[in-house]
UniProtKB/Swiss-Prot annotation:
GO MF terms, alphabetically ordered: ATP binding; magnesium ion binding; methionine adenosyltransferase activity
Compartments where found: Cytoplasm
Positions of Mg(2+) binding: D19
Family recorded in the similarity comment: Belongs to the AdoMet synthase family.
Protein name listed in UniProt: S-adenosylmethionine synthase
Cofactor(s) the protein requires to work: Mg(2+); K(+)
EC number per UniProt: 2.5.1.6
GO BP field: one-carbon metabolic process; S-adenosylmethionine biosynthetic process
Class of this enzyme: transferase
Region (Flexible loop): 101-111
Catalytic activity: L-methionine + ATP + H2O = S-adenosyl-L-methionine + phosphate + diphosphate
Residues binding K(+), per UniProt: E45
GO cellular component: a single term: cytoplasm
Length: 399
């Protein structure tokens, strides 16, 4: 069947979006705990609404952290510092409801089923079983230098730039909440050729005109981020298309941890297993295995074994080894997918403890991932973005 030209759209949000506030609070608490207790078990959920933050979850740790203080510092860092924004770091109420991790779950995670049944020794690897059942996907493609799909890459860069011009006061009338969306046109060969549509909605001071916002965002945000050669006279721009965005943040919408899982990953370009990341320590395979799957997929593409690769991992609670590993190259593979799966098994330890060791995940590195995407980041050093396995994969594949 002949491929046709088509459009694909992805979105991102700024750090001041209500759901992203929650992700950042949850990961700030996680980082604070991990900085003192690397073996802590953390599952921390946050919700925000007008004047209120609720932090709930299960945390098992030997240390103490001041959760309300962390919450307020995080909100302040985002920029909600005045009551007229509808949400203020100093005056909002902070409620906490924290329990310990279930003993039933801990029993499966502390020593994996294989260790309990004598199939492997604790000395072989710290015998950590998966903290839950589930399926996770990782993806990479050669559309950008960071091996990410172009639509989500541009959407994240626009969202980050929107925050930069607010914080450095280039556009001092902007407020923290905002969203971006980019539609890319692909040719008959599936290659991105142009940007078709850009949508930006940003919270702003009530007295600023739409005309000024439109002019300023095109000049200081879009032109600064989107390569000129990707835009043409047919590219459409929708800047604050409702005409006004004054009420925003938690005053405009309640927020929850884990409600921006497509923004966090590949913008809908690849499949998603459904599990969120923020607030979870690395024994939760929702997070660690999704990072490992990205690491695997990125190294496959970096090795030139495929132009795009999607890796699926699946786990059973309390069992260390993945119950399945699959690779889909969408017809772009230089070797068969069976060969790729075998290469993955031989080069990556995808048991939870193996992932933690391979990617050094017991560190406070998570808050920086909680806005602007967990993958394809060039502004921070994330271990799952390394391509240090690519040369070995290429050699073993005989290419």
């Amino acid at each position: 069947m002949t491929k046709q030209r088509h459009l694909f759209t992805s979105e991102s949000v700024t750090e001041g979006h209500p759901d992203k506030i929650c992700d950042q609070i949850s990961d700030s608490i996680l980082d604070a705990i991990l900085s003192k207790d690397a073996n802590a078990r953390v599952a921390c959920e946050t919700t925000v609404t007008t004047g209120l933050v609720l932090v709930a979850g299960e945390i098992t740790t030997s240390t103490y952290v001041d959760i309300p203080k962390i919450v307020r510092e995080t909100i302040q860092g985002i920029g909600y510092t005045r009551a007229k924004y509808g949400f203020d770091a100093e005056t909002c109420a902070v409620l906490t409801s924290i329990d310990e991790q279930s003993a039933d779950i801990a029993m499966g995670v502390d020593r994996a089923l294989e260790a309990r049944e004598g199939q492997m020794t604790d000395a072989e690897i710290e015998a950590i079983g998966a903290g839950d059942q589930g399926l996770m996907f990782g993806f990479a493609c050669n559309e950008t230098k960071e091996l990410m799909p172009l639509p989500i890459s541009l959407a994240h860069k626009l969202a980050r730039r929107l925050t930069e011009v607010r914080k450095d006061e280039t556009l001092e009338y902007l407020r923290p909440d905002g969203k971006t969306q980019v539609t890319v046109e692909y040719d008959e060969n599936g290659k991105p050729v142009r940007v078709d549509t850009i949508v930006i909605s940003t919270q702003h001071h009530p007295e600023i005109t739409w005309e000024q916002i439109d002019r300023d965002l095109k000049e200081h945000v879009i032109k600064a981020v989107v390569p000129a050669e990707l835009m043409d006279e047919e590219t459409k721009f929708f800047i604050n298309p409702t005409g006004r965005f004054v009420i925003g943040g938690p005053q405009g919408d309640a927020g929850l941890t884990g409600r921006k899982i497509i923004v966090d990953t590949y913008g809908g370009y690849a499949r998603h297993g459904g599990g969120a990341f923020s607030g979870k320590d690395a024994t939760k395979v929702d997070r660690s295995a999704a990072y490992a799957a990205r690491y695997v997929a990125k190294n496959i593409v970096a090795a030139g074994l495929a132009e795009k690769a999607e890796v699926q991992l699946a786990y059973a609670i309390g069992v260390a080894k993945p119950v399945s590993i699959s690779v889909d190259t969408f017809g772009t593979g230089k070797v068969s997918e069976e060969v790729l799966v075998e290469l993955v098994r031989n080069n990556f330890d995808l048991r939870p403890a193996g992932i933690i060791k391979m990617l050094d995940l017991r560190r406070p590195i998570y808050k920086q991932t909680a806005a602007y995407g967990h993958f394809g980041r060039t502004d921070v050093d994330l271990p799952w973005e390394r391509t240090d396995k690519a040369a070995d994969l290429k050699e073993q594949a005989g290419l």
